[in-house]
């Protein structure tokens, strides 16, 4: 087993102030900061103060797609950058991560919300020209800076989405172990333990997280870090992405007009997948409810019919063995699962 992990991790109030120190440790005096205008309006002055005396260029993006990746790459070449920083939520982080990877530069992750585990992982989520999702394995961040003073002020919905994404590791790990037993698939045990621990941290501390204190948000950030590193150790998203993610991706494909977030969908998918695994799905449902995350199709803004279709189509989306390959789902059983878990209302 070989793994590349972040060289520096700071999760505390004021972590943004460590950005110049991290860049110096990377031997870097010129950088590109990828962000969006909303994030910059909130924390831009802090970043400007931290980077005073260093050469940098700010690239504002609106979408995580190849055109914005190319803009970030062009900026990196123009200023002769020796690192690329992603400041913000999922989109700026993904664009910066992929631009850094394509340019052969270290990536510094500076999340302003913990809406999923992507801020610490080697995985990039982009959209192709047709709007279809792309998942690309790159390199993990060289450094991760989570400023709790900033992240704890993020919209509650984004943080609740992060809880949904992390508790989904309960079922992604179960799916990986199922694949090990039934197909002989190899997944490093340490990666599975890391992902398992991430989920357990959030479930054990959900009351503190639901209070949205810096300590609670810090637990969520640490769990996200652990999940991201689990993927780096495994060399794939396998420990952290199973049937619950397939359900989410299926919703993205078959209900593209919905407004739900990735982690919200994964959380509901984890309720369903826990039921299929024979787990106590109420533990996940109750944790999601405590932080205000959706637990029903109504909460996701989709219909029961949408969810049934997504569930039945989920296993077709990628070649990854999960509980969906074991349980012989049909429309009637899918409705039964959704109704018994309360994800869909009873008829």
UniProtKB/Swiss-Prot annotation:
Catalysed reactions, semicolon-separated: sn-glycerol 1-phosphate + NAD(+) = dihydroxyacetone phosphate + NADH + H(+); sn-glycerol 1-phosphate + NADP(+) = dihydroxyacetone phosphate + NADPH + H(+)
Cofactor (UniProt): Zn(2+)
Q: Tell me, what is an example of a GO biological process annotation in this record?
A: phospholipid biosynthetic process
State the UniProt keywords alphabetically.
Cytoplasm, Lipid biosynthesis, Lipid metabolism, Metal-binding, NAD, NADP, Oxidoreductase, Phospholipid biosynthesis, Phospholipid metabolism, Zinc
Give, as in the UniProt entry, the pathway in which the protein acts.
Answer: Membrane lipid metabolism; glycerophospholipid metabolism
Q: What Pfam families does UniProt report for this protein, alphabetically?
A: Fe-ADH_2
Which Gene Ontology molecular function entries are recorded, alphabetically? Answer: glycerol-1-phosphate dehydrogenase (NAD+) activity; glycerol-1-phosphate dehydrogenase (NADP+) activity; metal ion binding
Q: What is this protein called?
A: Glycerol-1-phosphate dehydrogenase [NAD(P)+]
Organism of derivation? Thermofilum pendens (strain DSM 2475 / Hrk 5)
